[in-house]
């Protein structure tokens, strides 16, 4: 049946602090870590730990990290996400808005921006190629919460994941080849994905399967053997076991295996952010070099590359 309703696209990402200050970071972390999708501990146990220990200690430290990657226009995640929305709108010629699960602009703000332009049917594209309950499902939760505050809600379709879309692997491969053309090719390619607690995967989260498939599809696009590429998980915190192998431990071990030069990328991140620009580019590089590595080269996220925008347009076209 033909859809006669005016359509729009809501691009969604995780979110970012409004400022690289302890207060700004504390507000963001508080909202983020209050979500049961992120930390599903009993509230009476978790909230005192969060507000009494984690936020007072972590906010000032994380603020300094944000300051090291902050751009003139603001947070890298927000800047690149805004560029994506602008380019996608220009390509599709329909309204495109940006919403964040945590922080600003909120999901509610993004939806209202579209509805103010007469949009009645929204295609929601969470910019998480691999599904996880900690990220993608949190977007669905956030939309439901936003809709509860609206007298009239739009119809909408939800793109759950796109790790298997051919244009996604092609865009990743193109970014790798472009990096190789400019910087030369290292001995080995490391694909570092954001981790989740192993317990969540044991309970049924399909994220690790999507990450493994992504790595296999990328290797196929690049013509790499299993010996040429390694998949790891980063960003763990707390004492709980997370998905393995861990990125930092893997980087420590590679030089002893004769792998002294590596390229590293973060396929789960649609835009560069703190976890890529600071954790990978700085911390992981230091870990690898200290372990005996000689050459560490970070391959940037897809950000607002034309191939990335083209892929988004192809995804949206499936729902128009």
From Swiss-Prot:
Keywords: Cytoplasm, Heme biosynthesis, Iron, Lyase, Metal-binding, Porphyrin biosynthesis
UniProt-annotated binding residues for Fe cation: 194, 275
Cellular component terms (Gene Ontology): cytoplasm
A single GO BP: heme biosynthetic process
EC assignment: 4.98.1.1
Protein's UniProt keywords contain Cytoplasm: yes
Metabolic or biological pathway: Porphyrin-containing compound metabolism; protoheme biosynthesis; protoheme from protoporphyrin-IX: step 1/1
Matching SUPFAM superfamilies: Chelatase
Subcellular location: Cytoplasm
Enzyme class, UniProt record, top EC level: lyase
Name of the protein in question: Ferrochelatase
Species of the source: Vibrio atlanticus (strain LGP32) (Vibrio splendidus (strain Mel32))
